[in-house]
Curated annotation (Swiss-Prot):
The gene is pgk. ATP binds at K197, E319, G345, G346, D347, T348. Belongs to the phosphoglycerate kinase family. Keywords: ATP-binding, Cytoplasm, Glycolysis, Kinase, Nucleotide-binding, Transferase. GO terms for biological process: gluconeogenesis; glycolytic process. Pfam families: PGK (PF00162). GO terms for cellular component: cytosol. This is Phosphoglycerate kinase. It comes from the Bacteria. Substrate binds at D21, F22, N23, R36, H59, L60, G61, R62, R113, R146. Pathway: Carbohydrate degradation; glycolysis; pyruvate from D-glyceraldehyde 3-phosphate: step 2/5.
Amino acid sequence: MSFLTLKDVDLKDKKVLVRVDFNVPVKDGKVTSKVRIEAAIPTIQYILDQGGAVILMSHLGRPTEGEYDSQFSLEPVAKALSEIINKPVKFAKDWLDGVDVKAGEIVMCENVRFNSGEKKSTDDLSKKIASLGDVFVMDAFATAHRAQASTYGVAKYIPVACAGILLTNEIQALEKALKSPKKPMAAIVGGSKVSTKLSVLNNLLDKVEILIVGGGIANTFIKAEGFDVGNSLYEQDLVAEATEILAKAKALGVNIPVPVDVRVAKEFSENAQAIIKKVSDVVADEMILDIGPESQKIIAELLKSANTILWNGPVGVFEFDNFAEGTKALSLAIAQSHAFSVAGGGDTIAAIEKFGIKDQVSYISTAGGAFLEFLEGKKLPAIEILKEKAIR
């Protein structure tokens, strides 16, 4: 890799600053999902095993920067980590003036966003954070697209900066899927808006043989094919863009299977009755909330031929059971595939959990925004600074 990884660095008797992604749901002072905490354990354990001292940093939620707010405190997260790793985890509420930690110990610092200058990565704050440790480990891929003090600035000023085990695994999986994929390659891009995924769609066109669109994005493509989408969520101002993408795909020999049938309802409701219709039969007062059985079959058949699958976003309103069939069929097709599969994004992970296919997906990314920016082909600031440090 073009940057140092944790295993390239001497950690014995070093104070190791680790930027983790512990932005987890907390309710009544208890962590309700520990997935992101568990994902950081290999990095933490490796540092301890190598004789280092661990200083953990993370954000939680969106507090007003520079102000303490107990509802965004990481104290419950420190307790949850202690239970998972079966070791004491000290909690440092005020930590910028120094952290008392010895080899073999773990300290969790309070929310980085309580510090003024975090989001703008001010030199003053970045230098203060860097002065706390000997080595900086970036292990929060979910925040790698942000040039903030705890993800980017600290790496500029600390003597050694490297990637943690989780970050290294994320980059390797994504590069395997995007930079050296085993062909044919299929990508699934779902979700409500074309506008947020337009550059992703354009970037993927040059890399894939199959591009499956779902959700509100698919509705915009259905409209681009000249069909009425009734009361469905779609973006009128991006119909021309969708038409261009379809034309470009045709020229490149990329298959975009725009839905041929859909499940519609008269209202956006969990209890709404799902009616299966051809796309040509959707009327003005109906909204498309899922793909239909014919479209499911087409997608499942296409995915059988793929050797690499990249998945970001559902193909319907899978949170409502009446409109979950399309995303369920997609999930099962990916689960049954022999392909190397990478999935990412909050809704995608929720679908994976709902349909119980976690063990059948080759790699599940913990990131949302950073995952998308990687798919767009953008450079991620927190990764770029690690590359720069490796050259120096």
